[in-house]
Amino acid sequence: MSSAPPPGGTPSPPPQPLPIPPPPQPLPVTPPPPPTALPPALPPPPPPTALPPALPPPPPPTTVPPIPPSTPSPPPPLTPSPLPPSPTTPSPPLTPSPTTPSPPLTPSPPPAITPSPPLTPSPLPPSPTTPSPPPPSPSIPSPPLTPSPPPSSPLRPSSPPPPSPATPSTPPRSPPPPSTPTPPPRVGSLSPPPPASPSGGRSPSTPSTTPGSSPPAQSSKELSKGAMVGIAIGGGFVLLVALALIFFLCKKKRRRDNEAPPAPIDGVPYGGQQQQNASRRSDHVVMSVPPPKSPSSAPPRPPHFMSSGSSGDYDSNYSDQSVLPPPSPGLALGLGIYQGTFNYEELSRATNGFSEANLLGQGGFGYVFKGMLRNGKEVAVKQLKEGSSQGEREFQAEVGIISRVHHRHLVALVGYCIADAQRLLVYEFVPNNTLEFHLHGKGRPTMEWSSRLKIAVGSAKGLSYLHENCNPKIIHRDIKASNILIDFKFEAKVADFGLAKIASDTNTHVSTRVMGTFGYLAPEYASSGKLTEKSDVFSFGVVLLELITGRRPIDVNNVHADNSLVDWARPLLNQVSELGNFEVVVDKKLNNEYDKEEMARMVACAAACVRSTAPRRPRMDQVARVLEGNISPSDLNQGITPGHSNVYGSSGGSTDYDSSQDNEGMNKFRKVGLETQDLYSNPISEYDLYPSWSSTDGQTTQGKATGNIKRPGQGYG
């Protein structure tokens, strides 16, 4: 019993455990004093029964308990403090430790083993660990001591020493096998001892310091994770900044190399210094052209034909927000959809050296080739006739005008190229050809009425945009079926702005050079050169008549008075409107498969558009709304009977223009056109027999009509 006082001294030993945490192994040495305390712990053994349920393998613990003392250190997490006490017994490697091992062999001996619990310090572990499992934790107090070793042991935790703990020396290392110590708690059932020594509760505080060491390990792991996340975020940010910087520098470099669009002509915006840049650029192109032919020499061409100095029929379609061409030297940012320049090398490579196999069509303007850019995008490359003043004017008009506009029903220019005398325009390729091809091409299936109406509405909207939404307004001057491209969904795209004119808001433009296509020209423009947006309206009316009747604008088989579609249709339009008998004018190929209300709207629009006096014609936005059914066809008449130019109640003709004068001018046009017999005698193609042409004196005496030759199956030229 005298030993009892020593237990009292045991509290002092707890301090020793404190230093032990740093040196994990030293801990076993300090425990020697505690052995005396072992007996006191014996009384509490019975209560520990609660702990045993936690661990099913009691038998193994019995053997292990003696040795676990050291092992408990790993268990700190487990809270089976009972074993820890035993560790102290092993620590006194003196003879006592051997004695303790024997008792562990029998589970019943736990009471004997309880002496090991004397380590009141064991309670210390409870504090380090979670209070919720107090029962087990008390037994684990010793583990707290061991926690300090864990840092070193972590490397070996996998070692199965738990069973070997029988040797006291091993205990320090045994910490890794905390799993084994857990069973000991049952055997010792020493869990009660911790409660028995409440005073030890204070000592646990010291062990608590050791457990603290384990949390740092976890926190360090958390910190390492956080650091990794932070590094990843920081790295991503730095990468984004670097990419942005590279993009900015590249863009800046491109701008330096930019070429301004060609010099303006007839009010087309853009500066004139482009010519110097163009010549310098062409020099570079000559040196870099991979194909055998350099830009200075024209690419291979088909045989020549008579030139008309007119706009061709071709232009490609450009869908909404379409993909831009791949970056190229001199890439420039322009207005609208227009994006920039191409070099001759790119276009030569895209068209396979401007090979004849890639030729889509040819006309007075030059040639059109199909090409494919490096990004796989199909394009149509229009090569304007070299050395032609008309070709240069068309080039300036297209670059200056098309680059300013963007509408889903207007063809947009993708880019252009200037190389020496070469002038090339690049459009997105449209594989479904033109309205003329589908309406008049030989062997073509009959176009359904729904498709015809859809094309009429789309092209009307495109023209309305040019007339109403562009400032200043743009007059196309060459509206015809072959200049309306369609995609596979039969959406219309108005093309070919080579003859387009920027109109003045105040004065009617009077041209000394009448240009357009025979059969589509407005009478006032053909006879006097007076050009307004209503000239486009007349031409569009002719296109509507083609959609309704399926006829061409000029009947080549009738060289007499009524060979014009307009002259034939005008008298019938009034009859159709009064009687509602559309069979007189409707295309027989439709077999009456059409909506009568929609047909009535289109007939009314066509009649209003082809009125002989320009002021009596409707605006294109009105035409588009009537075709869509948004307003009544009667809104187009304004007191005018369809097919006539006179106002109701008026005894005379229109005061704006003399219809007889217009008719006389048109008769002159017919005479000149029909005198050019080769226009009709030579087979140009199975469609598009009516080319654009021009008159140089404002009348028709000097005009020439020539054919735009097109390859079969293609709607370009």
Swiss-Prot record:
GO molecular function annotation: ATP binding; protein serine kinase activity; protein serine/threonine kinase activity
CDD domains tied to this protein: STKc_IRAK
Biased composition (Pro residues): 1-197, 289-303
Keyword Glycoprotein: no
Localisation: Cell membrane
Annotated region (Disordered), positions in chain: 1-221, 258-323, 632-665, 690-717
Membrane topology per record: Single-pass membrane protein
Cytoplasmic membrane side: 250-717
Name of the protein: Proline-rich receptor-like protein kinase PERK2
Species in which this protein is naturally found: Arabidopsis thaliana (Mouse-ear cress)
Gene, per the UniProt record: PERK2
